[in-house]
Amino acid sequence: MMCEVMPTISEDGRRGSALGPDEAGGELERLMVTMLTERERLLETLREAQDGLATAQLRLRELGHEKDSLQRQLSIALPQEFAALTKELNLCREQLLEREEEIAELKAERNNTRLLLEHLECLVSRHERSLRMTVVKRQAQSPGGVSSEVEVLKALKSLFEHHKALDEKVRERLRMALERVAVLEEELELSNQETLNLREQLSRRRSGLEEPGKDGDGQTLANGLGPGGDSNRRTAELEEALERQRAEVCQLRERLAVLCRQMSQLEEELGTAHRELGKAEEANSKLQRDLKEALAQREDMEERITTLEKRYLSAQREATSLHDANDKLENELASKESLYRQSEEKSRQLAEWLDDAKQKLQQTLQKAETLPEIEAQLAQRVAALNKAEERHGNFEERLRQLEAQLEEKNQELQRARQREKMNDDHNKRLSETVDKLLSESNERLQLHLKERMGALEEKNSLSEEIANMKKLQDELLLNKEQLLAEMERMQMEIDQLRGRPPSSYSRSLPGSALELRYSQAPTLPSGAHLDPYVAGSGRAGKRGRWSGVKEEPSKDWERSAPAGSIPPPFPGELDGSDEEEAEGMFGAELLSPSGQADVQTLAIMLQEQLEAINKEIKLIQEEKETTEQRAEELESRVSSSGLDSLGRYRSSCSLPPSLTTSTLASPSPPSSGHSTPRLAPPSPAREGTDKANHVPKEEAGAPRGEGPAIPGDTPPPTPRSARLERMTQALALQAGSLEDGGPPRGSEGTPDSLHKAPKKKSIKSSIGRLFGKKEKGRMGPPGRDSSSLAGTPSDETLATDPLGLAKLTGPGDKDRRNKRKHELLEEACRQGLPFAAWDGPTVVSWLELWVGMPAWYVAACRANVKSGAIMANLSDTEIQREIGISNPLHRLKLRLAIQEMVSLTSPSAPASSRTSTGNVWMTHEEMESLTATTKPETKEISWEQILAYGDMNHEWVGNDWLPSLGLPQYRSYFMESLVDARMLDHLNKKELRGQLKMVDSFHRVSLHYGIMCLKRLNYDRKDLERRREESQTQIRDVMVWSNERVMGWVSGLGLKEFATNLTESGVHGALLALDETFDYSDLALLLQIPTQNAQARQLLEKEFSNLISLGTDRRLDEDSAKSFSRSPSWRKMFREKDLRGVTPDSAEMLPPNFRSAAAGALGSPGLPLRKLQPEGQTSGSSRADGVSVRTYSC
């Protein structure tokens, strides 16, 4: 009964179903084991291959050692001649091998290209669908429709990228499949664990059911009891438990079936994952093979590139060495030519001497036919002639001696350079002493200023006395007129009484009465027309010191006299004895409250002077730091006493008699001894002016050394005249105390202060040196033909300022000084003087204002150059040695400026180079008005004036012109070298590469076309700016476009993101308009527009052709992209165009070698115009049919 209730449960199916996942795991394990074994086998093969490689290398090394040993034995065994022959044979073999290698490389390149094409065709056929559009696009973009090697490489690169992307996708799918397999294995293990747990529970429950049944049977048998109520109850409970267990077993079976189905699905998915993994591995192996092939090809290409780069670098080094050797040979050739010229000159001189001697010999032979003594002399002379011939024959030996002397001079130059290095310490010590002396001189200047201010107050107090003196003078003149009228009346009465005509006595009166009383006073010239007061004073004659008061210039009297004062006395010229008194009178009159100058005038004047002193001090400090020569010069001049020499010169020399009216009527009052006006000899023009202005000429008076002494034969003075004479003496003493020729005197003007003055004159400072030198230069030879030039205040007079206050001056004072310097230059140019006739201040003003030389060079020229003749005759070595200009470009700047001024100011200059008035130059106002009214007719004049006036100086070139060309990176080099518009056409390639650091050939080409643009505009800066403004908003006149304007045009096309690439690229309007070989592809390359962006390139091509056709004279060839026609040579292109902007007159006017373009067809171009490939850069693309590809560095 128990057997019927509890049937057996078959577990065979369950066990069979549980074996499936274990078998799947076993298969996976077997697969992993096979993969590991395969990996180990591959590693073993790799190790074997590495071992074989190591053994091969070892064997190769041993063979190399054997080869070296055999070569040594062979070299020992063979004789020397055979070795030389073998060397030559080896050289020939090496050359032959090099040629064969080149041929093999070319063949390999061709084979590689063919193999690459075949491989590409295979790959394209394999991946035709993915690469079809790319190939079509690339063939459409290429001009000729033929894919080149670069296109093949690009296609290979895209193919490799495609394979790489496929490999990544396969790897991603493999990784996902492996992750899914791992998850399924985990689920399988969990299900297996659950089944095991269920089996254990079933086994436990079965054992539990059997044990209670056995126990119940035993109890019944033991007790002998039958089946009662307890057994029925127990069976019912067991049946319920059995039903429950059957239900649970059914549920477990259902769950097991579900797990089996899931297991089968997992196995299927695992199989598919294994298949996909195999496919992925196959694809990966193929991709790895392709990648290895591509890497091998890439390594081959890199090796070829490295060999080409090495060959290029070696060629470049050889080229540089050849250039250096060429430069050395050129220098040696120039030196040999100079020596040869010197020898020719000497031989020519010897030949002339020989001819002269032969002529003299013939003359002596004719004269000495009968004289034996003369024959002896002739024999001696013949012997001397023979000696001369021998000397002439030994001329080559003398040349050798000269060469040896040249070598000795070079050695001396080296020793001098060593001495220059050793003198640096000496310069430092000298700078300390100079600083000390400058501080001491500054203190003395401050004391001097205080004393001058006290003297100024005394002058103001004396001005009232001067007014009183004027009143007394007026009264005296009235008394004189009354006395003269009485004398005439009395004489007429006497004549009437005696019966003589009055005219004869009136005519002889100046020679009778007055000449007897005042015999030493010079008389007036006959026929001079005088004013009433002039006539009275003329009759009275000059009475000693009063001549200084009566002979003051009329213009100064007119400026200083107040309204309602007396008419001025007659104008005359001061003699040497009365100049100091006249200066004192003029200074007091101009500084008096009644005049138009007061204390502020003197303060401003002192400020200007002290500012000039400080400027000179700074310039001296900069000079003494540069070269040994300037330091020695400073030392010698600082140790000298400039003020003593100045005082000695002024005390020993007398002034010439011609002190012009324009000199005394200068804008600034003569406040110091250094403002002594310039002197000039009398000229007919000035005599005519004097006659027109009623100015009588007088003879020169006593020298300066007579001082304020009154002649002893003057008439006995009246009390009023004695008082006037005492006031005149006091005024003369005060004027002498305020003179700037020496240090300040006491405020009282006493004799003690006069005796103390020589002690203060020995100030050993650079101030005294400068003032002494400049005073000597000013008082020197008055050899000038123009009175107006002589009366113009010079630069040294205005800049030399012994008592100025530099810190108190404003910009107005600098403007005044610049205006005075401009007046100097304009006066010199208005007179039409040649450059050699210019004086030192004019030359210094020209250097500072028109040439634009730095302050230290201007100071050096001021110290060393005293006239235009000295400046014009300076050679290159003298400029370097005397002025201290060591930079060759600075010397070039100075030489070109000197050549220009010498040519433009020479009397032989053509009429076209002069203005309508016949002068070479005009003032700034005249130039601006002329250029505003008659611009087209006077282009040559404005060009030359602009160059000469310095409007296109180095600051304009560095700050304006270079940025407009798109080359602002070279600004600092151009500014350091002071490159101005004159120098642009004279810069050669060596200077551009070396000193200006312009290594890029395209940048040099860009600079050349910028210079051509300036040539076509005749270097007219205003015309350039005007045309740029006019073409700012329109597409016209592209030649004057700047780099910024070109960038704006590119931005306006919608290519703003590429426009910034033109910064510092050298692209400007002149390059676009004048370079026939520059096309849109070059511009696209500089803009860095990618070749894939076909739309932007087409837009650029269209707009570029429109720009060239509308804004330039160029004409683009429509079939240029198809026919690949070569552009015309730059030599043919520039021969005709360079001469458009230069007329024959302007070419004749220029000095030799000044404008190479005016001489015709680029006489000596400073740089090659070919567009060479920039150094260190390979071309980005190549064209078929041998077309050269230009590349521009950007």
Curated annotation (Swiss-Prot):
Residue numbers carrying Phosphothreonine: T714, T792
Subunit-structure text: Forms homodimers and heterodimers with liprins-alpha and liprins-beta. Interacts with the second PTPase domain of PTPRD, PTPRF and PTPRS. Binds RIMS1, RIMS2, RIMS3 and RIMS4.
Disulfide bonds: none
Coiled-coil spans in chain: 26-133, 161-501, 596-644, 1014-1040
Coarse class of the protein's main subcellular location: cytoplasm
Biased composition (Polar residues): 785-797
Name assigned to this protein: Liprin-alpha-3
Gene Ontology annotations for the cellular component aspect, listed alphabetically: acrosomal vesicle; cytosol; epididymosome; glutamatergic synapse; presynaptic active zone; presynaptic active zone cytoplasmic component
SUPFAM superfamilies (UniProt xref): SAM/Pointed domain
Species the sequence originates in: Homo sapiens
Span list, region Disordered: 1-23, 202-233, 525-583, 624-819, 1157-1194
Function recorded in the entry: May regulate the disassembly of focal adhesions. May localize receptor-like tyrosine phosphatases type 2A at specific sites on the plasma membrane, possibly regulating their interaction with the extracellular environment and their association with substrates.
PTM annotation (Phosphoserine): residues: S17, S142, S207, S431, S508, S640, S645, S668, S683, S737, S794, S1123, S1164
Gene name in the database record: PPFIA3
Domain notes: The N-terminal coiled coil regions mediate homodimerization preferentially and heterodimerization type alpha/alpha. The C-terminal, non-coiled coil regions mediate heterodimerization type alpha/beta and interaction with PTPRD, PTPRF and PTPRS.
Residue ranges constituting the SAM domain according to the UniProt record: 838-904, 953-1017, 1041-1110
Domain of life of the source: Eukaryota
GO biological process, any: neurotransmitter secretion
Bias (Low complexity): 651-666, 1157-1169
Family, similarity comment: Belongs to the liprin family. Liprin-alpha subfamily.
Cellular compartment(s): Cytoplasm; Cytoplasmic vesicle, Secretory vesicle, Acrosome
Tissue specificity field: Predominantly expressed in brain. Also detected in sperm (at protein level).
Keywords: Coiled coil, Cytoplasm, Cytoplasmic vesicle, Phosphoprotein, Repeat
Gene3D superfamilies for the chain: 1.10.287.1490, Transcription Factor, Ets-1 (1.10.150.50)
Composition bias type Basic and acidic residues, residue spans: 202-217, 548-559, 624-636, 687-701
